[in-house]
């Protein structure tokens, strides 16, 4: 897609997520951070895949359009959501909300979708991955203690697989890094298409 000089392109991460920051840093990319303030509400009848793709695009586009150096940057936006029984489980608003989500995930399979969007002067490209996770049965005490840890408050589906909730997981099908918040394999392919260097370049 990009046919210019890759050395002059700078990556901007449109995310305040420490997890995504660590994962991008792990790819050996030089990057800056600029969080996007967008409405993350689900639209009526919006499918989960459409929802995460839209938010990833909107995050990247909002940061890109606010910049004055658009010819020199590539902006990466990402979004992750959890889907149970066809319903989108966003970030919990309080303990009761988190408890309801975790009860719903207990002992069952659910889906995790992550979209990554790259926006640059020449356009936008997005990729979406779907993974499946199965939780063991959770006790009420575990749910309460997990909430008390503070970990679920800012996470889709009220859990983070890379933290304490890793002990809830019986099986994973798909991309572990995507469940954490950034599908690394797919992200590297996009970065290379846009002329962004990683550790192996």
Curated annotation (Swiss-Prot):
Q: Which GO terms describe its biological process?
A: nucleotide metabolic process
| One term of GO molecular function | UTP diphosphatase activity
Reaction it catalyzes: dTTP + H2O = dTMP + diphosphate + H(+); UTP + H2O = UMP + diphosphate + H(+)
Gene3D superfamilies from the UniProt entry: 3.90.950.10
Which residues are listed under the site Important for substrate specificity? Answer: 19, 80, 162
Q: What is its EC number?
A: 3.6.1.9
Q: Which SUPFAM superfamilies match?
A: ITPase-like (SSF52972)
What is its cofactor? a divalent metal cation
Q: Which GO terms describe its cellular component?
A: cytoplasm
User: What positions constitute the catalytic site?
Assistant: 79
InterPro entries (alphabetical)? ITPase-like_fam, Maf-like
**Keywords tagged on the record:** Cytoplasm, Hydrolase, Nucleotide metabolism
**Compartment(s):** Cytoplasm
What domain of life? Bacteria
Q: What class of enzyme is it?
A: hydrolase
The record's listing under NCBIfam families reads: maf (TIGR00172)
What does the function comment of this entry state?
Nucleoside triphosphate pyrophosphatase that hydrolyzes dTTP and UTP. May have a dual role in cell division arrest and in preventing the incorporation of modified nucleotides into cellular nucleic acids.
Q: Which family does it belong to?
A: Belongs to the Maf family. YhdE subfamily.
Q: What is this protein called?
A: dTTP/UTP pyrophosphatase
Species source reads Hahella chejuensis (strain KCTC 2396)
